[in-house]
Amino acid sequence: MNQTAPEQLTIWTFDWVPEGPRGYVRDLRLRWACEEAGLSYRVGSVPFEDRGAEHRAMQPFGQVPYLTDGDVSLFESGACLLHLSEKSETLMPRERALRAETLSWVLAALNSVEMVSVPWWFVGLSSPPENPLEGWLRARLTVLEDVLTARDWLVDDRFTAADLIMADVLRPPWIRAIGDYPATEAYINRICARPAFAKAHADQIAHFSRADETREA
């Protein structure tokens, strides 16, 4: 495990992953948040193929990302995102009602949408004649389509952490291919066109590409 000075804000990810998940590993959410908020950070890495005790001391499930911020450490991308959001009004409004709405939508992305979309995807990998979760996912996407038909952003007519996490949950092409949701598609495209997303995405791809070179050397 790479070590870092304790005062640095550090996003921890794997040292390498196969091609498939690149661009979707969830440290991207934290890189993106830092880029949006203008927060200085570094990226540390832990072994993908040897998830030892030191890693599990920081992330009990042996996953990524986790975040260290001085003497504070957090795991789970949602918890880390909320911690970063408290550092910037760009991500988290300070007015109480808007803050509450942002928190609600962040958790909706993780609990009401991603909790359905990820199991739906895993079931689909086995190519069943009919995915039993598809109706559930379509119902959630229909709710979002109605919301996003009425407004451009989830909270306060501007980008917040709620949009960051919702767009990241929705952007995988296998989710976007499930049906015709034009307002949602426009929303994802608009958010993923932001320079902060482009940089975070490119940086993650570059991180794993450099690891390929090391493995091949």
Regions found by a protein language model. Give the residues of each.
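Terminal-tail/helix-coil boundary detector
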Residues: 202-217
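Generic domain-boundary/flexible-linker signal
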Residues: 20-22, 175, 202
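GST-like fold's C-terminal all-alpha helical module
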Residues: 4-7, 106-195, 200
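Short, solvent-exposed turn/loop segments enriched in Gly/Ser/Thr/Pro and often Arg
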Residues: 47, 161, 204-205
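Residue-level signature of transmembrane alpha-helix interfaces in integral membrane proteins
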Residues: 54, 179, 184, 210-212
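GST-like domain detector, emphasizing the conserved glutathione-binding G-site
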Residues: 1-132, 145
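Residue-level detector of family-conserved "landmark" positions at structurally sensitive sites
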Residues: 44, 77, 183, 201-202
